[in-house]
Curated annotation (Swiss-Prot):
Gene that this polypeptide is encoded by: EOGT
Catalytically driven reaction(s): L-seryl-[protein] + UDP-N-acetyl-alpha-D-glucosamine = 3-O-(N-acetyl-beta-D-glucosaminyl)-L-seryl-[protein] + UDP + H(+); L-threonyl-[protein] + UDP-N-acetyl-alpha-D-glucosamine = 3-O-(N-acetyl-beta-D-glucosaminyl)-L-threonyl-[protein] + UDP + H(+)
Function: Catalyzes the transfer of a single N-acetylglucosamine from UDP-GlcNAc to a serine or threonine residue in extracellular proteins resulting in their modification with a beta-linked N-acetylglucosamine (O-GlcNAc). Specifically glycosylates the Thr residue located between the fifth and sixth conserved cysteines of folded EGF-like domains.
Glycosylation sites recorded in the entry for this protein: 354
InterPro entries: Glyco_transf_61_cat, Glycosyltransferase_61
Predominant localisation class: endoplasmic reticulum
Protein name in UniProt: EGF domain-specific O-linked N-acetylglucosamine transferase
Sequence similarity: Belongs to the glycosyltransferase 61 family.
Keywords: Endoplasmic reticulum, Glycoprotein, Glycosyltransferase, Signal, Transferase
GO MF: protein O-acetylglucosaminyltransferase activity
Superkingdom of the organism of origin: Eukaryota
Presence of the UniProt keyword Ligase in the record: no
Signal peptide segment: 1-17
Localization (cell): Endoplasmic reticulum lumen
Length: 527
């Protein structure tokens, strides 16, 4: 009976402990709130969804005269979409499909459902459905290991890591880093099931290489004083993609956000440990973003070398390059866009980084052109295009170059979020489209024959996307000079026909003006 009770706790108590899950005060001090509501730190729109999954906080709020969220208590039916009790009409948005991709399905309704499961909160729901116990505790304070399919996500209690004999080299994701007995817990291990989950073994696709040596220990790591260090705070382990490339690094952040949903915890009173088996550091041009997820500096795994370290609560986060994951090389059904998941991610990060919407002012459409100081994919007639834009009085035009040494990432986000039409050549800088306002349009000036990358990202975020169509009106400097592949369209610079450019920009402007969320809804005849 005890074994069944413990198993039930594992499968149903999905949240990590943290600030937003801290128990309310039993006897409130007169004049003081019964709960630290400031620790929730979520956008106002997200509060009813949070309260839906944290009914204990909703109950306290109802009794507490100091609760700032009382107006949301009438909306507790609102849900993200992955909850089993969630009714479709109360979901946090639902994709829009405009045509049927016959390669996937034959109705618009099924297309919506496919897209929702591929790239929206249905994706988080599928990960929750996959969870199964791999190491079962016998007593309430034993260790445990719970994972999704292919070990893409795992959660562990009382995890033991022995780093006393670790050998590091240049390999960031060494597969045999831990030997038997060096990682594990005091629980009953289902070895056969664990070892059957290795089909997607790959550094940034699965935690199989790291957990295949998980061992059923004959001691209780913490209670038997087998740890040199005990980490009390909930800890997220992450294997990170390239920190110098916004497209790749934000695959890390998006998957961390999805992981928070799977855990039902958005607390920042957590540690994040970068799982890196090398002795190298990590170059991170977007480190300000971590402030949306943790109150502390990111910890390198090597910090714990030569020690036995025990983690009371540990999560192995969803990874940035998972097969059928989000959002690197994700095969998406065509004809659908607008995921609540990516809109919520954008709102979450902007809110926690204190990036606010400051306009538009006087109804003018704010156009931002992203210039490039790199060797390739420059706009050769950029000044000519800008001068043409400035002839339209309703456009407010600025040129930016997001050089990290000259413009900090938070300042970059402020510019992006206060842009209505974002224009740039194919490149990682277009990942900024994640933080455009809902009514905005992104204009990938030329996609360099990589057609899906930023089109799909715009579809996920739900902002309008356009790109250059007429090949006879774009003029490459030459055929391109890839260092090993020879001719390549990404390795040259381009000029553009001014009239065609203006036609496309005005199309984007028309979309902005017609968008239901555009703050100035009256049409501008000047355009």
């Amino acid at each position: 009976m005890l074994k069944l009770l413990v198993l039930g706790v594992l499968l149903h108590d999905v949240s990590l402990s943290g600030q937003d899950e801290a128990p309310p005060k039993a006897d409130g001090i007169p004049g003081e709130p019964l709960f630290n509501y400031a620790s929730i730190r979520l956008p106002e729109e997200h509060i009813p969804f949070f309260l839906h999954n944290n009914r204990h906080i909703a109950t306290v709020c109802k009794k507490d005269s100091h609760c700032p969220y009382k107006k949301h208590l009438e909306n507790l039916k609102y849900c993200w979409g992955y909850e089993k009790s969630c009714k479709p009409e109360f979901r946090f948005g639902y994709p829009v499909c405009t045509y049927i991709d016959m390669g996937w399905t034959d109705t618009l309704e099924s297309a919506q459902d496919i897209f929702w499961k591929q790239a929206d909160f249905g994706y988080a729901g599928e990960r929750l459905e996959e969870l199964h116990v791999l190491c079962q505790p016998e007593e309430p304070h034993d260790s445990s290991l719970l994972c999704s399919r292919y070990l893409q996500y795992c959660r562990a209690a009382n995890l033991y890591l022995d780093l006393r004999n670790i050998k590091r080299n240049h390999d960031r994701f060494k597969e045999d880093f831990f030997q038997s007995g060096e990682i594990g817990g005091h629980c009953t291990l289902d070895t056969q099931t664990l070892l059957s989950e290795g089909q997607r073994k790959s550094p940034l696709q699965s935690w199989f290489a790291e957990l295949q040596s998980y061992t059923e220990l004959n001691f209780r790591p913490i209670e038997d004083a087998k740890c040199d260090v005990v980490i009390e705070k909930p800890t997220y382990f992450m294997k990170l993609d390239a920190g110098v490339n916004m497209y790749h690094h934000f695959c890390d952040f998006v998957n961390l956000y999805i992981t928070q949903h799977v855990n039902n915890s958005f607390s920042t009173d957590v540690y994040i440990v970068m799982w890196d088996t090398s002795s190298y550091g990590y170059g991170d041009l977007f480190s300000d973003t971590w402030k949306a997820f943790t109150d502390y500096d990111v910890i390198h795994l090597k910090t714990y070398d030569s020690k036995r370290v025990c983690f009371k609560e540990a999560v192995f986060s969803l990874l940035p390059r998972m097969r059928y994951g989000l959002f690197y090389n994700t095969p998406l059904i065509s004809g659908c866009q607008n995921t609540g998941l990516f809109r919520a991610f954008s709102q979450h990060v902007l809110h926690r980084l204190n990036i606010t919407q400051e306009g538009p002012k006087d109804g003018k459409i704010r156009v931002t052109i992203l210039a490039r100081s790199t060797e390739y994919r420059k706009i050769l007639n950029q000044n000519e295009l800008v001068n043409a834009l400035k002839t339209v009085s309703t456009l407010e035009v600025q040129i930016v170059d997001y050089k990290y040494k000259e413009l900090g990432f938070l300042d970059q986000l402020r510019i992006t979020h206060n842009t209505d039409i974002f224009i740039g050549m194919h490149g990682a800088g277009l990942t900024h489209l994640l933080f455009l306002p809902d009514w905005a349009a992104v204009f990938e000036l030329y996609n360099c024959e990589d057609e899906r990358c930023y089109l799909d990202l715009a579809r996920l975020r739900g902002v309008h996307y356009i790109t250059w169509r007429r090949q006879n009106k774009v003029f490459p400097q030459d055929k391109g000079h890839h260092p090993t592949l020879g001719e390549h369209p990404k390795f040259t610079n381009y000029s553009f026909d001014v009239e065609e450019f203006m036609y496309l920009v005005l199309q984007a402007a028309d979309h902005v003006l017609q968008h239901p969320k555009w703050p100035f809804k009256k049409k501008r005849d000047e355009l």
